Structures are given as structure tokens and as C-alpha cells.
Amino acid sequence: MNDEYRLAGRNIWIVGASSGIGAALATELVARGARVAISARRKDQLDAVAAGQMTVVPVDVTDRAAFDDAAVQVREELGEIDMVVYNAGFWEQMDATAWDRDLFARHVEINLLGLNNCVGAVLPEMVHVGRGRLVSVASVAGYRGLAGAEAYGATKAAQINMLEALRASVAAHGISVTTVCPGFVRTDLTAKNTFPMPFMIEADTAARSICNGLERGQMEIVFPLPMAVLMKLARLLPVRVWAAAMRQVSK
């Protein structure tokens, strides 16, 4: 493992860590020797995840000023932030025939504008010190349009594009950018799904995959492998073929 990418001894801030992938990732990072701060809205849930081993900093990701204050608090508690992981996310299936503008906006507010708030809160200081890692959990749903995921998929595709552009822009400042694209992971978000979820994995398995990828210095971490292959291949299909496939799925 390249020492540049080691997790042990790093100051890592996870945003969206009260349950699911974020909580499992926080636990895995502590086990690998990282110093971890965790954030989400509910302090009681964060305290349960932290179990006295992590710094708890509650924050509403939609509140820009609160995000800036949280970043200051994390630095005061841990020191310079070596890595931030934006894992906050919202998912609810849409009925496109009864278009819900508020539901779409909620996806944008948390999944995309929250990421904007996160990057704005930590990037200037990373540029100043000349190092840092920005990590965001997107989704394989951002690779192609999926019926019912008009809002969720759009925000995840935007995340993927944003991070790809940002990676090139900040590399000269000693900052690396990693995009994490999970398939189906057993969490509170997926528990309400009524459709088939192939290749489902547990949150702790996802956390190990993320940590392994980070320690290898990967720019993109996609898992599980069967879902990664399926969705990567799906990107190559002609629009007409994909549209026909989605019509069958949405029947």
C-alpha cells in the first residue's frame, strides 16, 4: 500500500454517518486506525454509532452556514481534515406520470446541493495546505437513466460528472478526488424498495470495499463486481435498446 493513501492516522470526516454505509464506514475506518468525525442531523444516532470512539458533529447538510461551522469544529477537534466523505443521500421512487416537483427538489437539495456545501466548506483549506482527499458516495444509478429514479439518478449522474471535473481542477493543488458508486446495499434507504435488487450486499461489506479502494488510491470505487460490470456495460448500449429495456422494467 502506498503510504500516501494509508488510512491509519488520518483525520477523516464522514458526512451522512448515522446509519447504513456511512455508519459502517466510520466503524471500519476507526478499526483501520483513522481518527474519525461523523455528521448527520440526529445527534442521538451519531452518538450510538460513535460509541465513544469518534467525534460527533451534528449538521444539516442543506444549511450552508451550519456546514461551514461544522467544518471549523471538526478541525478544532481533529486538526486539519485529511479526507472528507460526503455520504448524505436521499432516495424515494418517483411516479413520473404524477410528477412531484417538491420530491425532485428534495433529491437535489440533499444529494447535490449538500455536496456543494460540503466541498465549499473544506476545499479552500485543503488548497491552502496543499493536500486532501474529497470522496463522495454517488451510485451506479448515475450511469444510465433508470425508470422510477428520475430524480435520484439525475443527482447521482451530476455528482459523478462534478467529481470528474473537480478531480482535474484540483490535482495540481495536491488534492485527490474519489467517486464511490455502490450498487444495492442493505440500508434504511433500500429497505422500502419493492422492486428486485440484484447482487445486494451488506453495509459492512460496502465499507470494506470503500476502504480497500481508498487505500489503493482509486479514483472510482464501484461495487459489487457483478453490478459494476452490468452497469458499465449498460452505458455502452444504444439509446433505443436501453429505452426498450426500461419500458419492460416499468410495466
Language-model region placement:
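Conserved glycine-rich cofactor-binding loop
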Residues: 18-19
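Substrate-binding pocket helix/loop in short-chain dehydrogenase/reductase
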Residues: 95-108
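Active-site helix of classical SDR
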Residues: 119, 155
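Rossmann-fold cofactor-recognition segment
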Residues: 51-65
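Conserved glycine-rich Rossmann-like NAD(P)H-binding loop of the short-chain dehydrogenase/reductase
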Residues: 32-49
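Residue(s) in the substrate-gating loop at a strand-loop-helix junction
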Residues: 139
